């Protein structure tokens, strides 16, 4: 069977080695005679798995000791709510930087839940010669006392990425759902990081939260117990039954990433993959991209065919060639190739070859 390369934005492809290992031990995990899906989350065997997963993630991301690592329910949207309820209190203020669809969605959720609290926002994307560009404000010039500033460094729908780390006088809350572990960051600059698992961590249903200890002292609002960071810390992410199979697969992904050389190594490959695809787009008048070079996403490469009437044929022929899930988000249309950590370089080589051949045939 020919290779199939899955460019889905999420749930995304998992490393082949992880999938094969999960397949091999699906019915008998760790010599238990049963699946990892069937054992108690409080058993010593599963606790050992969770401890190793956290240890591996801490090593990969160089997470300081004054940060808690939580494995939670709810995905990214669940954390939109949890951030507000855990940190804003009844009279707090927060600032949301809007760079695309997901940061906008976080803002809408915050406004819905804030009550008497104040939610401010800044649109940080402008048009430069018809292309989307991020313009980061000087936050130190803003006279306000915010509990936190929220932003999303990578917008999967819009194909926009912010590579410069934010400089803020207030704690930074970041949605890293689509960039976590794709490149190195300084965790100590953040008050809280959250990430839905279904892009660079594992399957959907799990979210990772990395929260600095002092953030847990901020006033909170009444909320669901399973989204209470303080309870999650107190109960080692097991206030209720966690998504155990997703946790297991996340642990395997962390181990796989360590075995491949860690984040510094995968970051070089990710950069190479993105550069290769953007060079194809820029080098062919058949395709176009709407983002300035400095803010083009490495994880989610969006592009359009100049002749949009060929979109359906492009997707049909790509599917036949084993290149799946290339259709752009319904809001923006066009095409999108998601190049998360699990996407091998060979997948991008195959996509570029197909794009060049398709353009030559239909130009």
Curated annotation (Swiss-Prot):
Matching InterPro entries: Aminotrans_V_dom (IPR000192), Aminotrans_V_PyrdxlP_BS (IPR020578), Pser_aminoTfrase (IPR022278), PyrdxlP-dep_Trfase (IPR015424), PyrdxlP-dep_Trfase_major (IPR015421), PyrdxlP-dep_Trfase_small (IPR015422)
Keyword Cytoplasm on entry: yes
Keyword Cytoplasm among record annotations: yes
Top-level division of the source organism's lineage: Bacteria
Class of this enzyme: transferase
Binding positions (pyridoxal 5'-phosphate): 76-77, 102, 156, 175, 198, 240-241
Binding note for cofactor: Binds 1 pyridoxal phosphate per subunit.
Any one annotated GO CC term: cytoplasm
Cofactor(s) needed: pyridoxal 5'-phosphate
Reaction catalysed by this enzyme: O-phospho-L-serine + 2-oxoglutarate = 3-phosphooxypyruvate + L-glutamate; 4-(phosphooxy)-L-threonine + 2-oxoglutarate = (R)-3-hydroxy-2-oxo-4-phosphooxybutanoate + L-glutamate
Self-association state and partner proteins as the record states: Homodimer.
Functional note: Catalyzes the reversible conversion of 3-phosphohydroxypyruvate to phosphoserine and of 3-hydroxy-2-oxo-4-phosphonooxybutanoate to phosphohydroxythreonine.
Similarity remark: Belongs to the class-V pyridoxal-phosphate-dependent aminotransferase family. SerC subfamily.
Protein name per the record: Phosphoserine aminotransferase
The organism of origin for this protein: Shewanella baltica (strain OS223)
């Amino acid at each position: 069977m020919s290779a199939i390369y899955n460019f889905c934005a999420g749930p995304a492809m998992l490393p082949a080695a992880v999938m094969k290992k999960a397949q091999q031990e699906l019915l008998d995990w760790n010599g238990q005679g049963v699946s990892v899906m069937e054992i108690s989350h409080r058993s010593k065997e599963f606790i050992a798995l969770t401890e190793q997963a956290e240890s591996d993630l801490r090593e990969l991301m160089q997470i300081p000791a004054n940060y808690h690592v939580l494995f939670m329910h709810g995905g990214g949207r669940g954390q939109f709510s949890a951030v507000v309820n855990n940190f804003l209190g009844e009279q707090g203020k927060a600032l949301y930087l809007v760079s695309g669809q997901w940061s906008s969605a976080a803002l809408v959720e915050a406004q819905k839940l804030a009550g008497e609290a104040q939610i401010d926002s800044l649109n940080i994307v402008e048009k430069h010669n018809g292309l989307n560009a991020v313009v980061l404000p000087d936050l130190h010039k803003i006279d306000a006392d915010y509990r936190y500033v929220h932003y999303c460094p990578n917008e999967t729908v819009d194909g926009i990425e912010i590579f410069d780390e934010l400089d803020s006088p207030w704690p930074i809350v970041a949605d890293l759902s689509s960039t976590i572990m794709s490149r190195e960051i300084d965790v100590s600059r953040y008050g809280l990081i959250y990430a839905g698992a279904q892009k660079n961590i594992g399957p959907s249903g799990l979210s990772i939260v990395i929260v600095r200890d002092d953030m847990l002292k901020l006033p909170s609002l009444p909320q669901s117990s399973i989204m209470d960071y303080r309870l999650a810390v107190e109960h080692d992410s097991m206030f209720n039954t966690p998504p155990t199979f997703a946790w297991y697969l996340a642990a395997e992904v962390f181990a796989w990433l360590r075995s491949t050389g860690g984040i510094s190594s995968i970051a070089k490959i990710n950069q190479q993959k993105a550069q290769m695809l953007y060079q194809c787009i820029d080098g062919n008048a058949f395709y176009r991209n709407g983002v300035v070079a400095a803010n083009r996403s490495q994880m989610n490469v969006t592009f359009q065919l100049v002749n949009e009437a060929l979109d359906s044929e492009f997707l049909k022929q790509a599917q036949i060639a084993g290149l799946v899930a290339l259709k752009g988000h319904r809001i923006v249309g066009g095409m999108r190739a998601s190049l998360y950590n699990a996407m091998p370089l060979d997948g991008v080589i195959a996509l570029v070859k197909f794009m060049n051949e398709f353009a030559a045939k239909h130009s």
